[in-house]
């Protein structure tokens, strides 16, 4: 984080690259994320820019334990894989580059801040800080309210992104998110975090 304490990541601040530099833009980004059930066990997400261009697509298991999700670019190339780590008091996911499961390809780990909470609250640990048993200091934190799957993402005290839930045909498994990504922030990282938070909190 910059030396001067601020409440929001801004133009000119250092890039926050978690997945890849190619997903960091020097300006704020407004994204629309659409989620739809594909069949009984699978659903998918599509991410669009304000012009309607497809940027990312995520598919995988909608229910169950040890879930796996895959993020791809518009051409279908795999960017990263998200895997839920079985039964635990605190939901935990590991995210690797491509289809890998290898430790050296680990991008980040996501874990619920508390075992039981009515609000969105998750911690993100980068590989050099992913031994959550030895440290309680996370690299990023996402927190939200009680009523829906809306939350904000912080690096220390600085806001780096915001996710807003919007109602759609909820009974049909369709709903959207509006995402605001601050300048120089890796939007693929923010979208992956959104999907894992949604999976943790939604069973529809």
UniProtKB/Swiss-Prot annotation:
Signal peptide from the UniProt entry: none
InterPro entries found in the cross-reference section: LOR, LOR_sf, Tubby-like_C
Pfam families: LOR
Family affiliation: Belongs to the LOR family.
Entry function: Might be related to the phospholipid scramblase and tubby-like superfamily of membrane tethered transcription factors.
PANTHER family from the UniProt entry: PROTEIN LURP-ONE-RELATED 14-RELATED, PTHR31087
Protein's name according to its UniProt entry: Protein LURP-one-related 14
């Amino acid at each position: 984080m910059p030396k001067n304490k601020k409440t929001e990541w801004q133009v000119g601040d250092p890039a926050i690259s978690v997945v890849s530099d190619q997903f960091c833009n020097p300006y704020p980004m407004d994204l629309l994320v659409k989620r739809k059930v594909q069949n009984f066990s699978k659903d998918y997400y599509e991410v669009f820019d304000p012009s309607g261009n497809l940027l990312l697509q995520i598919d995988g298991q909608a229910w169950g334990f040890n879930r796996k999700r895959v993020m791809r670019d518009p051409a279908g190339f795999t960017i990263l894989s998200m895997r839920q780590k079985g039964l635990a008091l605190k939901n935990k996911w590991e995210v690797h580059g491509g289809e890998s499961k290898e430790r050296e390809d680990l991008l980040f780990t996501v874990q619920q801040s508390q075992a039981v909470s009515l609000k969105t609250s998750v911690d993100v640990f980068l590989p050099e800080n992913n031994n959550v048993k030895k440290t309680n200091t996370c690299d990023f934190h996402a927190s939200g309210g009680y009523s829906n799957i809306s939350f904000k993402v912080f690096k220390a005290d600085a806001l780096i992104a915001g996710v807003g839930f919007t109602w759609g045909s909820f009974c049909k498994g369709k709903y959207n998110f509006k995402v605001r990504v601050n300048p120089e922030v890796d939007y693929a990282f923010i979208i992956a975090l959104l999907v894992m938070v949604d999976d943790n909190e939604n069973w529809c």
